């Protein structure tokens, strides 16, 4: 819970940064708060163990000789060093089967047995590709374990030999080496950059061709995801430049698994900062990425929404590239998607558009998305309501008076005020700031807005917030009461009624200036 508060505080600090600094109003992806943004998808793990389908079955037909209960590690280690090729291959195969057939493979036991150097030596045996394959497979599964277990493989000097095996004439050996390297790269930025420094990218990308079997290409794409993953630090710029052309090819692939991983790779790159966002934009891939927001597979939609969502955390210019691809036309479906997590991510995306310039705010209005945001503000699950509160509050900073007046016309005040009673202090602050901003912008129409707030029970909620434990909240609640609700003469003064707009809707006096200070505390 403390981590959530810390992240939310940072988010709020960024949001309120130095007046109308629109770039800092854009909010980076918050992996702890937004569950959708956590990667706990089986097909997208950092590390993967190679377990043959037949080994998953309980009544596996593994020969009894290789079953754990009938196989002593000591004998396996001894036989793995045998000069007899048949005995050696059987022993290495036995080790591999121990590592791939068990739900809880005895990785530590095998490491302690001293077999690692023997397996690594087997990788050098060009005269025996079957032995290379079995040894690579065993090492792949050791590297699929904890960080310490992966490090044991790295420290045994296996990586240069795996890179060498990428050039093996035997495809199964190549593929197993790719898998092993994927597990090592997936351990973290240090391992990633170490493998990159040894030259993994060019041979890896050379496998991408029409003739490659689909299972092999899936593995290659998954390794590319791991190369793009992690942003502390992000991958080297030259690596990104090498990988992007391949992603531009793979984004047209018909295989869903390959497409999903390609788009996740883009989402990781765009999560690293504006410089990386610009590299992705310059690759020309965005026009091919945006249509995936309406892909029939939810997995593809989710990844695409994340990737474009990251791009719009960038500058106004970078955001405009996404909008120019007709991105907003996909959002009515995303905002009404049966999966709440998609709704939440979609509103988060839009909150970064409403943090943009006035033309971008207008684009959201013109796409008829504001009523849908307000509906989710009212009826969505709490995570979605929270994102909607940010979207509305951002609009009160970025928008023109007529754009903020449009919020009032769409009846934003009641659902906005309803969030004043939630336990999440950041949401309460964001709503109070939005209300304060609307009231300040209304100027001589503030009385009418105040009446709307009072009629829906908002005034009572604001009064109660004067006793809130959070200093910022009770001060702002007091200021709102003091500035806009302290007068007793709430009569129908004609001068306080908003000027008429078509259809008798609200309008603010356009001669007054938009406040430039942003949210004030």
Swiss-Prot record:
**Domain remark in the UniProt entry:** Consists of an N-terminal hydrophilic region, a hydrophobic central region composed of 10 repeats, and a short hydrophilic C-terminus. The N-terminal hydrophilic region contains the importin beta binding domain (IBB domain), which is sufficient for binding importin beta and essential for nuclear protein import.
- List, alphabetically, the GO terms of the cellular component aspect: cytosol; male germ cell nucleus; NLS-dependent protein nuclear import complex; nuclear membrane; nuclear pore; nucleoplasm
The molecular function terms of the Gene Ontology recorded here are: nuclear import signal receptor activity; nuclear localization sequence binding
Q: Where is the IBB domain?
A: 2-58
Entry's PANTHER family? IMPORTIN ALPHA
Query: By its UniProt entry, which Pfam families does this protein fall under?
Result: Arm, Arm_3, IBB
Complexes and interactors: Forms a complex with importin subunit beta-1 (KPNB1). Interacts with SNAI1. Interacts with TALDO1 isoform 1. Interacts with CYB1.
Q: Report the family membership.
A: Belongs to the importin alpha family.
| UniProt-annotated stretches for the region NLS binding site (major) | 137-229
Q: Which residues carry this modification: Phosphoserine?
A: 60
Descriptive protein name: Importin subunit alpha-3
Q: Does the keyword Acetylation apply?
A: yes
Q: Where are the ARM repeats?
A: 66-106, 107-149, 150-194, 195-233, 234-278, 279-318, 319-360, 361-400, 401-443, 447-485
């Amino acid at each position: 819970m403390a981590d959530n508060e810390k992240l939310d505080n940072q988010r709020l600090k960024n949001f309120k940064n130095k007046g109308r600094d629109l770039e800092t109003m854009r909010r980076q992806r918050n992996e702890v708060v937004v569950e959708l943004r956590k990667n706990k998808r089986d097909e997208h793990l950092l590390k993967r163990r190679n377990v043959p389908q037949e080994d998953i079955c309980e009544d596996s037909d593994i020969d009894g000789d290789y079953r754990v209960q009938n196989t002593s590690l000591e004998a396996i280690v001894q036989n793995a060093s045998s000069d007899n090729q048949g005995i050696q291959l059987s022993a290495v195969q036995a080790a591999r089967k121990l590592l791939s057939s068990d739900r809880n493979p005895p990785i530590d036991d095998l490491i302690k047995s001293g077999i690692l150097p023997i397996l690594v030596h087997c990788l050098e045996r060009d005269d025996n590709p079957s032995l290379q394959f079995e040894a690579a497979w065993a090492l792949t599964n050791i590297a699929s374990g904890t960080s310490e277990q992966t490090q044991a493989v790295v420290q045994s000097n296996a990586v240069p030999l795996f890179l060498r095996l990428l050039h093996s004439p035997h495809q199964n050996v190549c593929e197993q080496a790719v898998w092993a390297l994927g597990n090592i790269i997936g351990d973290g930025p240090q391992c990633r950059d170490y493998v990159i420094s040894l030259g993994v990218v060019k041979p890896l990308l050379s496998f991408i061709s029409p003739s490659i079997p689909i299972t092999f290409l899936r593995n290659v794409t998954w390794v590319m995801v791991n190369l793009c993953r992690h942003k502390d630090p992000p991958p080297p710029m030259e690596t990104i430049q090498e990988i992007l052309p391949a992603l531009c090819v793979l984004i047209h692939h018909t295989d869903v698994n390959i497409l999903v991983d390609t788009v996740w790779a883009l989402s990781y790159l765009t999560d690293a900062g504006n410089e990386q966002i610009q590299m992705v934009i310059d690759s020309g891939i965005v026009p091919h990425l945006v249509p995936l927001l309406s892909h029939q597979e939810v997995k593809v939609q989710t990844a695409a929404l994340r990737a474009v969502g990251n791009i719009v955390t960038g500058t106004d210019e970078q955001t405009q590239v996404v909008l120019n691809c007709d991105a907003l036309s996909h959002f009515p479906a995303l905002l009404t998607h049966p999966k709440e997590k998609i709704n939440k991510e979609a509103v988060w995306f839009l909150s970064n558009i409403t943090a943009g310039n006035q033309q971008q705010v207008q684009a959201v209005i013109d796409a008829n998305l504001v009523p849908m945001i307000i509906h989710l503000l009212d009826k969505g699950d709490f995570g979605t309501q929270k994102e909607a509160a940010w979207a509305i509050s951002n609009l009160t900073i970025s928008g023109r008076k007529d754009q903020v007046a449009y919020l009032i016309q769409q009846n934003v005040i009641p659902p906005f005020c309803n969030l004043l009673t939630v336990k999440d202090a950041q949401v309460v602050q964001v709503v109070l700031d939005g209300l304060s901003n609307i009231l300040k912008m209304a100027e001589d129409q503030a009385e009418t807005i105040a009446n709307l707030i009072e009629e829906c029970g908002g005034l009572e909620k604001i009064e109660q917030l004067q006793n809130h434990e959070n200093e910022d909240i009770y001060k702002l609640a007091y200021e709102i009461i003091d500035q806009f609700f302290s007068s007793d003469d709430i009569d129908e003064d004609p001068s306080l009624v908003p000027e008429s707009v078509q259809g008798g809707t609200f309008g603010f006096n356009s001669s007054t200036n938009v406040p430039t200070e942003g949210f004030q505390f």
